[in-house]
Amino acid sequence: MQRSLNEFLTPRTIEVNQINATHAKVTLEPLERGFGHTLGSALRRILLSSMPGCAVVEVEIDGVLHEYSTVEGVQEDVIEILLNLKNLAIKMHNRDEATLSLNKKGAGPVLASDIQLDHDVEIANPDMVICNLNSNGDVKMKLKVARGRGYEPADQRNSADDETRAIGRLQLDSSFSPVLRVAYNVESARVEQRTDLDKLVIDLETNGTIDPEEAIRRAATILQQQLAVFVDFDQQNEPEKVEEQEEIDPILLRPVDDLELTVRSANCLKAENIYYIGDLIQRTEVELLKTPNLGKKSLTEIKDVLASRGLSLGMRLENWPPASIRGDDRVLGG
């Protein structure tokens, strides 16, 4: 089959070999020669460094002031406990932060399943051992969980100021990425008479908070979003203009008829294309007195009616007319 020189092959087959719930191999073929390494390297970097996820960022343990302490009745020292908590696989559904509690006493292991969870927080590895207690062991701790991306050292976290943070709040270097391991391999592929094509095989393992197939899909979406700007160089990278919310008092949007003026005064205002109360209050006394057939008696009536509603003549409105009446031909004619 003859192909144009400008026409690139696109993958026809995506095969997912699910080894277990957290481990899968994804095969993509065929690819033009060289594209296996191009896409494989880019996806691998994103999967390892840029995937969003959740992790423990702060820990409070009763009776512990710093990470070099020990806890009576606990076999592990505090540093070991913190290292174990870094391996906690947490998933939050509808928020960016949560504070969880753990209270355990008596001999035996303290597991991730012993953590008291909120309704929208899950732990994917409930059998993970946090520490081990002796017969007189008693441990109480609070865990602050946050959502983030990639790897974040504790000293770069802006949420905790060293001077104001309470003593005993231990900060953790956090790896938010749900991807534990990823590798790729490029093999040969064939389509009809072409034998110089690539087949990309991605071997991926996650912590259980996301399945491997979804992880690759998210990584590909991130890559697509980053490359989209190169598609159209002429597109202006100006920030989108966000229209300020127009805060207009509802009374100003009401017609002048609602003021229940005399017929003479109402007709004079309409003759000057003054249809809304917002139009009226922006006129001055001098301007209204220039209106044909509108005398001082009518002017006094208008001022009194406006005053009863907390309004007056000569007021200035920044966003008038608002969008809701901007298309009104009567307003445009004023």
Curated annotation (Swiss-Prot):
Domain of life: Bacteria
Catalytic activity: RNA(n) + a ribonucleoside 5'-triphosphate = RNA(n+1) + diphosphate
Naturally occurring in which organism (per UniProt): Hahella chejuensis (strain KCTC 2396)
Family stated for the protein in its record: Belongs to the RNA polymerase alpha chain family.
Residue ranges of the region described as Alpha N-terminal domain (alpha-NTD): 1-234
Stored Pfam families: RNA_pol_A_bac, RNA_pol_A_CTD, RNA_pol_L
NCBIfam families assigned: PRK05182.1-2 (NF003513), PRK05182.2-5 (NF003519), rpoA (TIGR02027)
Key words of the record: DNA-directed RNA polymerase, Nucleotidyltransferase, Transcription, Transferase
Cellular-component GO terms for this entry: cytoplasm; DNA-directed RNA polymerase complex
Enzyme class: transferase
Region (Alpha C-terminal domain (alpha-CTD)): 248-334
Subunit structure of this chain's protein: Homodimer. The RNAP catalytic core consists of 2 alpha, 1 beta, 1 beta' and 1 omega subunit. When a sigma factor is associated with the core the holoenzyme is formed, which can initiate transcription.
Alphabetized HAMAP family for the sequence: RNApol_bact_RpoA
Gene3D superfamilies: 5' to 3' exonuclease, C-terminal subdomain (1.10.150.20), DNA-directed RNA polymerase, insert domain (2.170.120.12), RNA polymerase, RBP11-like subunit (3.30.1360.10)
InterPro entries: DNA-dir_RNA_pol_insert (IPR011262), DNA-dir_RNA_pol_RpoA/D/Rpb3 (IPR011263), DNA-dir_RpoA (IPR011773), RBP11-like (IPR036603), RNAP_asu_C (IPR011260), RNApol_insert_sf (IPR036643)
GO molecular function: DNA binding; DNA-directed RNA polymerase activity; protein dimerization activity
Function of the molecule: DNA-dependent RNA polymerase catalyzes the transcription of DNA into RNA using the four ribonucleoside triphosphates as substrates.
GO process annotations (BP): DNA-templated transcription
Protein name: DNA-directed RNA polymerase subunit alpha
Keyword tRNA processing: no
Comment block on domains: The N-terminal domain is essential for RNAP assembly and basal transcription, whereas the C-terminal domain is involved in interaction with transcriptional regulators and with upstream promoter elements.
